[in-house]
């Protein structure tokens, strides 16, 4: 059990805006259970998206391309895919960080980036004849239960909360975690981002509003920043990142980030882009970075006309010196509430291997669109994420200093 520590002995760090290190990584994705499968998928340039059949009555043609997480019910962690994937990712990230020299500080907090929670358990609950389940199962459905189980397993007792900002939830969690470290709320943070909502009911709704493409392979239908793109392909992910100010071997340093809200439309980007521009500029300002120091934009890039046009405009106007822009959604799918967290792994991969894991270009597109696995030039990256409803977010990430 960790020794009790007087908060005054570590709160002297409060207010010191030092880089926040990503010290450990865990992931469950359409590639498989474990971050290694993500690295392998990025290296090979292969998509995790597969064709799923038997969806008659939900999607046109009864089949859809989506990067779902396998059930793998033999793994420990709980009765649902959601719970098992979250706890697996957390275990992997903590073990990874420990191997790299990280040790839990006196106050380890947990932030869970999520949107819909355990959709399969809630779906079964509402579809039951009586609308009731046993008390134990009902408690397991609560979003705080799996966090409590994860923290109990690791003897963590710091602050814990869930954050939601639609598709920008992962970035929202990252920015919140940095504020905790900067102000002394926690000494370390486990950031979790979980979204296993790739069920037929949700896929159909995204198709209905014209943003998802279900009937074409990923590289054909989802073409971020290219002509002929029809939208995004669905995806699922559970990601865990160990975040700390400790001087240990790290994957990347998060310098800062910002968020704004358009407050204009539930489904569209404000055409004047005032708030989106402010978001990127504030992210640079709080990070102490000039736009000219940014080499790449790891974009939200869902392949929808509005989002791609907006981020391309940001690239052209705010980052004219950047080497390029890319989006890994054709590779890993749009993982909704976990999107920006799982896409942060692409930045980590680039820093660790020296290659940008961009999908191949299949049509004419933006002149600075990175195509295929490409050698990386030195410089910082901005991870942007846009959430349905008007959420804008940007996080500035630098190569690790340790």
Q: Model segments located where?
A:
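Phosphate/pyrophosphate-binding loops at sites that engage ATP/ADP/AMP, CoA/4′-phosphopantetheine
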Residues: 91-108, 154, 247-251, 279-296, ...
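Short, well-ordered amphipathic alpha-helical segments that serve as non-catalytic structural scaffolds
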Residues: 85-98, 144-146, 272-288, 314, ...
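Flexible, low-complexity linker/loop segments at domain and module junctions
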Residues: 1-22, 104-105, 291-293, 369-402
């Amino acid at each position: 059990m960790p020794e009790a520590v007087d908060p005054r002995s570590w709160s002297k760090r409060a207010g010191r805006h030092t880089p926040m290190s990503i010290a450990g990584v865990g992931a469950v994705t359409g590639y498989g259970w474990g971050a290694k499968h993500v690295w392998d998928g990025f290296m090979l340039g292969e998509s995790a998206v597969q064709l799923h059949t038997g969806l008659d009555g939900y999607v046109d043609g009864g089949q859809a391309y989506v990067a779902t997480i396998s059930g793998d019910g033999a793994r420990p962690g709980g009765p649902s895919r959601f719970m098992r994937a979250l706890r697996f990712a957390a275990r992997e990230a903590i073990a990874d960080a420990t191997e790299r020299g990280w040790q839990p500080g006196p106050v380890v907090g947990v932030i869970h980036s999520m949107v819909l929670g355990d959709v399969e358990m809630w779906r079964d609950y509402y579809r039951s004849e009586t609308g009731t389940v046993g008390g134990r199962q009902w408690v397991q459905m609560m979003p705080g239960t799996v966090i409590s189980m994860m923290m109990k397993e690791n003897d963590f007792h710091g602050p814990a909360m869930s954050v939601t900002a639609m598709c920008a939830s992962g970035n929202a969690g990252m920015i919140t975690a940095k504020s905790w470290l900067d102000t002394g709320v926690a000494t370390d943070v486990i950031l979790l981002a979980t979204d296993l909502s790739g069920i037929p009911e949700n896929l159909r709704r995204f198709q209905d509003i014209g943003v998802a493409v279900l009937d074409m392979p990923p590289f054909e239908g989802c073409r971020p920043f290219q002509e002929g793109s029809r939208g995004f392909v669905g995806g699922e992910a559970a990601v865990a990142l160990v975040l700390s100010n400790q001087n240990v071997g790290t994957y990347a340093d998060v310098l800062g980030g910002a968020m704004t809200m358009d407050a204009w439309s539930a489904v569209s980007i404000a055409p004047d882009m005032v708030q989106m521009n402010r978001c990127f500029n504030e992210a640079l300002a709080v990070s102490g970075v000039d736009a000219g120091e940014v080499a790449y934009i790891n974009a939200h890039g869902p392949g929808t006309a509005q989002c791609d046009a907006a981020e391309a405009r940001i690239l052209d106007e705010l980052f004219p010196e950047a080497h390029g822009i890319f989006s890994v959604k054709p590779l890993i799918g749009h993982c909704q509430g976990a999107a920006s967290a799982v896409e942060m792994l692409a930045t980590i991969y680039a820093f660790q291997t020296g290659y940008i894991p961009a999908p191949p270009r299949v049509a004419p597109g933006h002149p600075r669109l990175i195509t295929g696995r490409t050698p990386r030039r030195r410089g910082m990256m901005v991870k942007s994420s846009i959430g349905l409803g008007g959420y804008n977010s940007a996080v500035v990430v630098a190569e690790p200093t340790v």
